[in-house]
Every structure is written in C-alpha cells, then in structure tokens.
C-alpha cells in the first residue's frame, strides 16, 4: 500500500474506533431513563433490565467474534468493518425508535453480532504495519478508546437534556457518516493471495480457553484477572443507575462523571504507568494497584454525597497500574511462539466476564433497592467488587509465592 494511502487508512481506522467508542459513550448516561420509560418502572427495576441488555450484547459478541474474524480472513477486512459500522447504526436506530424493551434487546443482539470493529480494525492495522511502526499504530487503538470515552459520555449527557432518545439518533448518525466515508475511502488491507479458507474450528469461541489449561503455572494469575474483570462491572454496568438512584444525578451529571473517569484512566494508562512500573516493579505494581481498586470500591459503596464519587474516583482509577503489570507477568510466563494464542485467550476471557458481570452487578443493585428489599444498600455491587478484589490480592500473592519456589 502506498504511503499516502496507508496514512489515510490508519487515520480512518482511528476515526472508526473513535466514533465507535464515542457512540457507545453517548448512550450510557441516558440508557437508565429510556429503560424506565419503556418498562414504566423505577430506576431499581430498570437496572435489572440494563444488566440483561449488557448480557445480550456480550453473549452474542462472544459467540460471533471468532466467526467474524474468520470471515475477515476469507473475504478481507474492508467489508467486515463496513458491515460492523452499518450494524451499529441499525442498533442505535432500533434503540432510538424502540416502542418496547424488546426492541432494545434486538438492537443489542444486532450490535453484538456485527460488533467486531475493534478485532477487525486490529487485524487491519497488523496488515498494513511494518515492524518499525507496529507499536505506534496499535497505540492509536488505546488513544481512540480513551478519547472516545471522554467525549462520548459528556456529549451524551448534554444531548440527553433534550430527550432520552436524542443521543441514540446522534450515535446512529455518526455511524452512518463513518460507513459512507469508509465505503468511498477505505482500501482493502488483506491481499487476495494472503487470504485463507473459512474454518469452523477456528470460529469456535470456547477453543481458546483450552490454551489456558495447557499452562497451569499461570492459573492463579488468570483467576485473579477473571475476578478483576468481573469486579470492574460494578462500575461499568452500575454507575449510571447507582448515581441516579442515590444522588438524583441528571444525565448531564452522569455524563460529566464518566468523562472524568475516561480522563483519569487515560492519565494513569498513558502517563503514570510509565513512571510507576520501572520504579515499583511489576509485582508491587499489581499489589498497589489492587489495593487502590479495593479502596476505591469500598468508598463508593458507602458514599453519602455525590461529590464523594468524584473524589473516590482517584484511588479507583489509580488501580489501573495493576492491569498492564499483571498482563506483562502472564505474557512472560508463556513462550514467544504462543503469544498470539495467549492474547486471543485473554480476549475471550474478557468477553466471558462481560457476560457474567453486568447481570450479576445490576441484579444485586435491584435486590437491595426494590420495594421489598430485606434492607436498603444501593452500594452492594461495589461492596461485592471490593470483596472480589481482596480475594484477587490473596490469589496473586499465593501465585507469586509458588512461582518463587519453582
């Protein structure tokens, strides 16, 4: 690919991911109110449906991502990326027009089936990158996520002021514009002579878990990673419902708070980690990070004023020094010729926890906030997440202890 076309293609992939994440971020602040409107119930009941909507998206994406990845190997990246963008636009239109809650489920399932833009975009970047610029180009994925999660929720909160459905129309419009831009501009990255036949064995979403079973030496660290991912859904799936219920936050305030989350995560992942990991080392980074996560979650659980949530975001987001260090230790425990398989397995693992986490955390919120609850404790999901983080500290300590003995 010519250099000018290559730069344009990389720019398009960055914009694609940015719009994807921005579109997703736009709808987060208004989902609770839209669900309330459709089921004619309070925020507690809406949270339960919100968790199952998260499940519907994550489950279909888990099943279809390997299938879509295989299709991109056979037919090329361009058609898959374009179908993905169109699928997201259809999803957002379904959500905007939804006359009943079941339309939301149908929209989320459509998005889960077609929503392989990140996977296919990563493959696209791998196709057109050289060894010298590969890391820099892949860094654009992280940058798009960070920027999109700052812009999206804030924009969604502002648009939500004009109606719960307005942000969905905005997200659909962004995806359709991106689809049209890609249709006319985006070149194919995978040459026909490099394509391979579709194989149902490679399209098996469970197959990658077998790889982890071949490496019992990392089983403890993998278990800790699972608990961390599940605990994260106390914030990811529950934040909007909790803050609206507990502090009467508007969509605008929810959007601003999530924009702050995106900014803090970006600062920790982009800047702080470069300073902490060389000085603390990977093992201490994991311990300190897990401790910060746990402290932040415990404080969220018992927050009594809205401003406290902003203050408590600081220790929680500082916990972000843990993840990269933990993944680094895991990758060092696996031979270099198995790294691709390992990353595929870790991605499948994250998808699987996204199936479990949302309904677990939102149903727990419902259990402790509905009219017949044994007692009111809206912070229960954060408290459960705190316990999971504490257990992960014990597991990682035990795993490192065993490693030292080997």
Residue map of PLM features:
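Helix-breaking motifs and short loop linkers at transmembrane-helix boundaries and internal kinks
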Residues: 76, 97-102, 114, 248, ...
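C-terminal transmembrane helical hairpin of 12-TM major facilitator-type secondary transporters
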Residues: 283-326
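A membrane-interface helix-boundary motif in multi-pass transporters
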Residues: 160-173, 363-389
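Juxtamembrane intracellular "pre-TM" segments in multi-pass secondary transporters
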Residues: 2-7, 187-224, 245-246
């Amino acid at each position: 690919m010519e250099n000018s076309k290559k730069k344009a293609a990389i720019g398009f992939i960055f914009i694609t991911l940015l719009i994807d994440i921005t579109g997703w971020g736009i709808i987060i602040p208004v989902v609770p109110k839209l669900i309330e409107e459709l089921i004619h119930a309070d925020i507690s009941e809406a949270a339960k449906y919100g968790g199952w909507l998260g499940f519907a998206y994550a489950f279909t994406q888990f099943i279809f991502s390997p299938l879509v990845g295989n299709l991109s190997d056979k037919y090329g990246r361009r058609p898959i990326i374009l179908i993905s963008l169109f699928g997201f636009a259809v999803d957002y239109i379904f959500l905007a027009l939804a006359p009943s809650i079941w339309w939301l489920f149908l929209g989320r399932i459509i998005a889960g089936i077609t929503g392989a833009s990140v996977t296919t975009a990563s493959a696209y970047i791998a196709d057109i990158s050289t060894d010298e610029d590969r890391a820099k180009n892949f860094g654009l994925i992280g940058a798009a996520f960070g920027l999109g999660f700052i812009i999206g929720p804030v924009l969604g909160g502002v648009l939500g002021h004009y109606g719960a459905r307005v942000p969905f129309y905005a997200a659909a419009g962004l995806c359709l514009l991106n689809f049209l831009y890609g249709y006319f501009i985006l070149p194919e990255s995978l040459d026909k002579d490099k394509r391979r036949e579709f194989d149902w064995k490679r399209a098996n979403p469970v197959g990658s878990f077998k790889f982890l079973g071949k490496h019992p030496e990392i089983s403890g660290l993998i278990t800790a990673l699972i608990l961390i991912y599940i605990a994260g859904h106390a914030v990811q799936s529950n934040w909007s419902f909790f803050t609206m219920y507990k502090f009467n936050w508007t969509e605008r305030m929810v959007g601003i708070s999530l924009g702050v989350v995106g900014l803090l995560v970006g600062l920790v992942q982009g800047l702080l980690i470069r300073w902490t990991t060389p000085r603390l080392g990977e093992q201490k980074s994991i311990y300190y990070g897990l401790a910060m996560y746990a402290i932040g979650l415990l404080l969220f659980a018992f927050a009594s004023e809205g401003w406290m949530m902003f203050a408590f975001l600081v220790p929680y987001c500082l916990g972000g020094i843990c993840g990269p260090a933990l993944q680094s230790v895991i990758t060092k425990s696996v031979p270099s010729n198995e790294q691709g398989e390992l990353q595929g397995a870790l991605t499948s693992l994250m998808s699987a926890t996204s199936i479990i986490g949302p309904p677990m955390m939102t149903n727990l919120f419902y259990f402790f906030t509905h009219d017949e609850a044994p007692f009111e404790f809206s912070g229960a999901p954060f408290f459960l997440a705190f316990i999971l983080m504490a257990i992960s500290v014990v597991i990682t300590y035990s795993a490192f202890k065993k490693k030292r003995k080997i």
